Regions:
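Extended beta-strand/beta-hairpin segments
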Residues: 1-49, 57-142
Length: 142
């Protein structure tokens, strides 16, 4: 079984440093509106970002296997927080909006790559919220 580890170290206030097993470290804090610091990673950013980055990497993997000529890829991701009556909250929905420009393929091939990325994205498959995909696909002429 594969394992991924991190270590969170408190640095004072509502902040800390996240140390990842593959090397990088990131300062983090609560969001500014919750007594956090501006300009650093928040757990909420990391959650939405982990879905966005994992999905992108799996899309690149699928594009390579399907021999799609990828010209460009970018994706905006938004997490929608639901506030509950008991004063707790959760991400109820996440929305990915990838913008893809490909060449030398069909739109259907790009859509297949998107489906494969969804299926094989570890983070997507692990999320307990609804994840929606609204792609903007452009197939450029050869």
């Amino acid at each position: 079984m594969t394992e991924y580890t991190t270590r969170a170290e408190w640095t004072g206030g509502h902040a800390g440093v996240l140390r990842c097993s593959n090397g990088p470290s990131f300062p983090f804090s609560a969001p500014e509106k919750l007594k956090g610091e501006a300009g650093v990673l928040t757990p909420e950013d990391a959650f939405v970002g982990s879905l966005n980055t994992c999905f992108m990497l799996m899309f690149i993997w699928a594009v390579e296997r399907l021999k799609i000529g990828l010209v460009s890829y970018s994706c905006d991701a938004t997490g929608f927080v639901e506030d509950r009556l008991d004063r707790t909250s959760r991400f109820g929905r996440l929305l990915l909006r990838p913008r893809i420009v490909a060449r030398g393929c069909t739109r259907e091939a790009v859509e297949r790559a998107l489906r494969l990325a969804e299926k094989y994205s570890l983070v997507w498959q692990s999320v307990n919220a609804v994840v929606e995909l609204e792609p903007e696909i452009t197939v450029a002429p050869d």
